[in-house]
Amino acid sequence: MVKDNKIMDRFVSMEKHGCPICGYSDITVLDDFNLTTYEICECCGSESGVEYDQYSTPEAITKVRNEWVVEKRCEWWGDKSSIPKDWVPYSQMKSAGIKVPNRD
């Protein structure tokens, strides 16, 4: 039986660790069964399984990311005392291989 991969090709290939929205590495977004964990990213506040999941399209991920960058100005979502030293959100996204959206 041949599967139609055109539908599956529309989804984002998501890693188990690391936020696909902001690139913050200290989050597990998929469990061992590739199901969402419903963890909330300390950095951007996006919740695995709510704002995005393993079936999200690149456009859906980009929309959530743009909301964080443009509307929320990359504000740290969690406890301010947990912000990493020398944290730069645009560098974090670039390091995670995320195309950094325009700030305007």
Identify the meaning behind each predicted range:
Residues 7-10, 18-20, 30:
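Short hydrophobic membrane-inserting helices
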Residues 19-22, 41:
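Short cysteine-rich clusters marking metal-coordination/redox-active sites
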Residues 2-11, 56-104:
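Short, intrinsically disordered terminal segments enriched in charged and Pro/Gly residues
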Residues 16-17, 26:
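C-terminal, charged low-complexity interaction regions
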Residues 28-29, 50-51:
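Short, non-ligating residues that shape and space the ligands of small metal-coordination modules
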Residues 24, 46:
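Short Cys/His-rich local motifs and their 1-3 flanking residues in nucleic-acid-associated proteins
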Residues 30-39:
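Short linker/helix segments within small regulatory modules
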Residues 11-12, 34:
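Aromatic-acidic/polar surface patches that form glycan- and anion
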